[in-house]
């Protein structure tokens, strides 16, 4: 069982567990209110840098991740998305357990010519380690750049204030606590 690191994670865990009990479609985008997603905080082997992608939709440097789309193995989703969005070949979990939890608000937007209403992402984050020597490439339909940042620079690079303060800083604190 996941042990929350703070009040935010404890509340979000309770929301997620309640949502799972009440919704059979929690892992699909067919649930327009909320659905599960998986993200990765990708670090190099010395854990001094994090890999970020310039997200086209949010117009911000961001972690990697995506929708579960029916898959309940969220670690597999996080790994798949990390590889797809960055071109990484050598990437693996630091450990298989959940690293962080977040309930994230997504504004209404257009995707592939279709309106997507405001909804929540019930997000599970995994800590991944990658070979900083791997060639990186963007995934043009989702991002337009991928690069390594020093941990604190990764936070500063994001223009999403809420993500900086509530997610990326928390992830860096947790990485540093690992030693």
Where are the regions a protein language model picked out?
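Phosphate-binding glycine-rich loops and adjacent basic patches that engage nucleotide phosphates
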Residues: 2-3, 37-48, 117, 128-136
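Acidic, metal-coordinating catalytic segment for phosphate/diphosphate chemistry
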Residues: 3-39
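Short low-complexity stretches enriched in small and charged residues
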Residues: 7, 40, 79-83, 169-170
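Charged phosphate-binding loop/patch that engages nucleotide di/tri-phosphates or the phosphate backbone
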Residues: 159-179
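Unchanged
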Residues: 69-162
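Aromatic- and glycine-enriched beta-alpha-beta binding-site module
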Residues: 49-83
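Glycine-rich, flexible loop/turn motifs
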Residues: 23, 32, 57-59, 64, ...
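N-terminal strand-loop-strand
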Residues: 28-63
